[in-house]
């Protein structure tokens, strides 16, 4: 009998969470602004998700895009958000703190863990893909293990987990059960089975999304409500949603 591989789905709203569970996900990571890599979801979203699904909910605490070295104002916001999320029923908190030199901010990470555990002693703690930009990933793991972080989300310091498979395998071996290694970024039904076999991981993280169109902007392609990238804006008449069919396709591929 094959060992169970846990599948965590990255979600950006309440509907995403419901569709993830419908597709068979074991757990979700709840964010907002997935295009920016995932930011803190609203407390209303956390409450709505917890009212709608029964699988564990890991809540992202990331107040802004653009790095992981935060001001004191950012940090106070993160602490308040995390406490509110735990009180709203979050099963885990996802976060990441780096110093200006790119190393794990040991002091702030330790203090944040203290804040979380004061609110709920057994809250699950996850250090996110900030680890993918540290100068020494194994040194970073040592710090996180020492501080008692439960899990780390990583692409193996590459653009996708598939490209970072060798590093992820080495991280898994180095951790040796002292911290969970959760690979994510670019994993789908077409590559997940081979990726698992190559790395030996026991869990995977993916988004499994499809595009949905909103006709309310009337096809006006001159209007952009956000910023521009290379002179172009993100289309305002479309957004991505978790697709239960795609979620199930990943699960089917895992089981092959």
Region annotations inferred by a language model:
Residues 5-11, 28-30, 57-61, 93-95, ...:
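Hydrophobic faces of well-ordered beta-strands that scaffold small-molecule active sites
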Residues 1-10, 50-51, 220-226:
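N-terminal amphipathic alpha-helix/helix-capping segment at the start of soluble metabolic enzymes
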Residues 175-256:
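C-terminal alpha-helical cap/extension of soluble enzyme domains
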Residues 47-84, 95:
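Structural motif corresponding to the early beta-alpha repeats
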Residues 15, 34-55, 73-75, 97-120, ...:
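Active-site-adjacent beta->alpha loops and helix N-cap segments on the catalytic face
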Residues 2-28, 33-40:
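N-terminal pre-domain/capping segments
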Residues 23, 52-56, 87-92, 115-123, ...:
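A structural motif corresponding to the C-terminal end of an alpha-helix
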Residues 12-23, 66-82, 132-147, 171-173, ...:
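Catalytic cores of alpha/beta
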């Amino acid at each position: 009998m094959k060992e169970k591989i846990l599948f965590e789905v990255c979600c950006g709203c309440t509907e995403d969470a419901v569709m993830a569970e419908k597709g068979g996900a074991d757990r979700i990571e709840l964010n907002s602004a997935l295009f920016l890599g995932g930011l803190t979801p609203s407390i209303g979203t956390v409450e709505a998700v917890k009212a709608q699904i029964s699988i564990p909910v890991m809540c992202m605490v990331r107040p802004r895009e653009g790095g992981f070295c935060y001001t004191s104002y950012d940090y106070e916001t993160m602490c308040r958000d995390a406490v509110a999320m735990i009180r709203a029923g979050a099963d885990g908190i996802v976060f990441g703190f780096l110093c200006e030199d790119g190393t794990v901010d040991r002091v702030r990470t330790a203090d944040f863990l203290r804040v979380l555990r004061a609110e709920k002693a057994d809250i699950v703690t996850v250090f996110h893909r900030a680890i993918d930009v540290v100068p020494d990933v194994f040194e970073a793991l040592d710090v996180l293990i020492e501080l008692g972080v439960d899990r780390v989300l990583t692409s193996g310091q590459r653009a996708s987990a598939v490209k970072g498979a060798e590093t992820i395998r080495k991280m898994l071996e180095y951790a040796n059960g002292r911290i969970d290694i959760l690979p994510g970024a670019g994993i789908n039904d077409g590559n997940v089975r081979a990726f698992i076999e190559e790395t030996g991981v026991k869990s995977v993280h993916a988004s499994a999304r499809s595009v949905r169109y909103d006709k309310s902007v009337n096809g006006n392609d001159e209007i952009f409500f956000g910023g521009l990238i290379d002179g172009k804006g993100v289309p305002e008449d479309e957004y991505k949603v978790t697709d239960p069919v795609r979620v199930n396709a990943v699960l089917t591929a895992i089981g092959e």
